[in-house]
Amino acid sequence: MPKRKDIQKIMVIGSGPIVIGQAAEFDYAGTQACLSLKEEGYSVVLVNSNPATIMTDKEIADRVYIEPITLEFVARILRKERPDALLPTLGGQTGLNMAMELSKSGLLEELGVELLGTKLSAIDQAEDRDLFKQLMEELGQPIPESEIVNTVDEALEFAAGIGYPVIVRPAFTLGGTGGGICSNEGELQEIAENGLKISPVTQCLIERSIAGFKEIEYEVMRDGADNALVVCNMENFDPVGIHTGDSIVFAPSQTISDYEYQMLRDASLKIIRALKIEGGCNVQLALDPNSFKYYVIEVNPRVSRSSALASKATGYPIAKLAAKIAVGLTLDEIINPVTGSTYAMFEPALDYVVAKIPRFPFDKFEHGERRLGTQMKATGEVMAIGRNIEESLLKACRSLEVGVDHNELPALSQVSDDELMRKIVKVQDDRLFYISEAIRRGYSPDEIAELTKIDVFFLDKLLHIYEIEQELASHIGDSYVLKKAKQNGFADTKIATLWDMTAQQVRRIRQDQKIMPVYKMVDTCAAEFESATPYFYSTYGFENESVKSSKESVLVLGSGPIRIGQGVEFDYATVHSVKAIQAAGYEAIIMNSNPETVSTDFSVSDKLYFEPLTFEDVMNVIDLEQPKGVIVQFGGQTAINLAEPLSKAGVKILGTQVADLDRAEDRDLFEQALKELDIPQPPGQTATNEEEAIEAARKIGFPVLVRPSYVLGGRAMEIVENEADLRSYMRTAVKASPDHPVLVDSYIVGDECEVDAISDGRQVLIPGIMEHIERAGVHSGDSMAAYPPQTLSQKVKDTIADYTKRLALGLNCIGMMNIQFVIKDEQVYVIEVNPRASRTVPFLSKVTDIPMAQVATRLILGETLAELDYEDGLHPESFMVHIKAPVFSFSKLAKVDSLLGPEMKSTGEVMGSDRTLEKALYKAFEASYLHLPNFGNVVFTIADDSKEEALQLAQRFANIGYGIWATKGTASYFENHGLHVRLVEKIGSDDDKDIPAYIRKGKIQAIINTVGTKRTADKHGQIIRSSAIEHGVPLFTALDTADAMLKVLESRSFTTEAI
């Protein structure tokens, strides 16, 4: 079937902010889809609330709306744009749920908008647990015994009948939210209650647990003419029972026989055909390791995290083709863009092994619950390609950026055998390292397989890695063993440790012995046809397939896996940098390890190397490509940390030089620079041990802000009020030493703002100043920010512009820099300078219409601002108000406190724009799912130091008709000041009348909870905060955010005053 001519305009719904379970893979899918539809000549309208994405760039669609993905706003856009059709299957769960809502509201029918791709009935059949069960029974496909329940009692009754353990799966939720494995009645009671609340249709599936089966996934495609094929099949290293997003995954499957492969393939194709899915679909199956018995676990009728992985693992662009199928093209009409010669109807064949390892946020959340189950917890993932399992697994381990270069955590050698076994059985995010340690201690693969239900085949590979370690240790300098270790993915640094030499020495031995990697092409067809993709991975074998081009090239380092503090914003900057390199006439080469992102789409750059971002792996590419230089400004801290070792090895770093990067990051050098430039900063000192820290704090005066130097996203930062707290911080939070000093600064309570600037060494362009809504003390990544600034005087703005220019020129900055200021009594202080692109680049680029990363890249390559037609100084402000608001994933992370402070906790962001501050704030709150009704009850539980300020907020809430509830101390303060309050217990002896109980009953619409500076003592507050999050009740832990919400509520309510 040729493409449809009866539709011209298509609306695509994006997936909104990044949360755990729905990350950058949808930016990649949405970007591909929009471009794919434009390529076919359709007009595309895009709606997405997340500014940090490539897909919300003007050139991706014909009309781009950065608006909340809620019925209210999407309906307005539909009425305004009147598209012929809507494509919802590329926006993750958000897009699907929105399509469902629009359809149920009758709006699609009223406007005559057709749904493209998979039909709603099919989405319903796959997502609604009851309909799915019926369909599987009709097809004769086995599913675990299960029961659909709408009440907790029904759940308990069913479980009593089939026996524990059982799995709870709420309907229509994302990333296993609200689900879990229950091994007894108490656990089921709690999880089922929560799951029913979270499910938008109050429905859960309770099923017999098949934990311990092998988990196999098939990524399948089907078109409107019923052609269907398997793009990729993948096998989880971890058995069923751990969410696939949290599992280590290999592609293609490693341990199943051809018969099993065909059996599961047939089942997957049968299911996608029965559901009549048009586009991509992911089928998860459980296979009994001891027989040919299997079960269908679930089907995702949309592009998913697994399809991003499958696309990158095979080179087959699923989202791009899904969009073409949606407009009527068939697989036998679409040319496979990888080979450029075969059609898309070919099933990809792989002659390599791909390993994916999830990246977890527990380096940020030390108290988080690390146990893994059916609810996803990873924020991102890495992928590595090799010629064998050992190679791809070890490359993936060193891509994780958790301070390891091998499947080994040095600290585990101290762990007792009992503890080791406990960690292997009760699965945590770092189980791979515990299993590897057990093998080093002589436990056999069979013993471990018995405990973990992981296939012995994989454990044998871990044993093989250990055997090579032994061989290396006993054959120092032996080139045969060295070659074997390299072919199995060992890093130079690991070999160096075993040989007791430096990694440089190992590298030299390799060069002398000609043991160098070759680069192989990812071509979808195991080299059977000619292929046109410049997409490579390294391995130690024969025949190098990557040829250095005659054109001068520039290498851009990506930012690795998505984690808290280093999100998709850096990928955005990387992609823009590549565009600018190409526009300047150079060949652009990207190196990155993240399968979810746009930067690792092989059509973005001239060459893509899918490799770990380590010194060794980067140097190997540089040796081959001999680029003009390397750009490290856009890859976050990952890339910046490589600047010094690369520069020492004689590599040219383009843009700001290493010595100047050091001046911004090293405390003493930075203070020196500020003195020379005559710029004030909060008084501070560095300390290399506990006593020095105490002495510094006495001199400066409490409160102080303490943090280690050289970190991203505010890791291990705290505001400390007294000596006892400071001592405990120095003992527990950081390991201070002369090499790694701790910074002790005076903590100034003032307004915070930040600036991104672009400099060519002579002139400095400041696109705009962003003013934070929360005062200093909340990490900039977790603050709401307004552009243009709403409360700064002209004098302060001029000072900020002046200091920014002095800093950029004084630090010899070429390209980008980000500066954070705090303002108190009209006095401006510099808090910190980051000599690189920051996480605000996408937001500021969108609201000022300056493609900042592109401009910075052109300057890095030697052009000037004047040549690019940009003025020196502060860019004129826009007349619209734009708000950037953070989005958190606390509901996925048990035991992580949602209290905001100097350590970053948000996973994503949204933007709200309008003509007034109140309207922009309203949109930002709606987009970040903080919805407050016009009236209801608000609970105040406030620390002593902010009761006075909270009183004014409470009075404003009362004026618009809210009921004011408060806990004991706060209530008596409010009553003494003439405000009528209902007293409520924090955590009561009668657990039917305390705050968590009222939250459960839906009696509380918002909670405002601040904590004194001694944060640790607040156990009750933590329980209240987590119950608010579990039940989706808006929670404000900073009074400034509550004030912003009040502005919105006040602007929406009429004034009713007696005369």
From Swiss-Prot:
The large subunit is composed of 2 ATP-grasp domains that are involved in binding the 2 ATP molecules needed for carbamoyl phosphate synthesis. The N-terminal ATP-grasp domain (referred to as the carboxyphosphate synthetic component) catalyzes the ATP-dependent phosphorylation of hydrogencarbonate to carboxyphosphate and the subsequent nucleophilic attack by ammonia to form a carbamate intermediate. Residues 133-327, 671-861 form the ATP-grasp domain. It comes from the Bacteria. Its EC number is 6.3.4.16, 6.3.5.5. The keyword Magnesium applies. It comes from Streptococcus gordonii (strain Challis / ATCC 35105 / BCRC 15272 / CH1 / DL1 / V288). Mn(2+) 4 binds at E832, N834. Belongs to the CarB family. Binds 4 Mg(2+) or Mn(2+) ions per subunit. NCBIfam families: CPSaseII_lrg, PRK05294.1, PRK12815.1. It is an enzyme of class 6 (ligase). This is Carbamoyl phosphate synthase large chain. The gene is carB. Residues 402-546 are annotated as: Oligomerization domain.
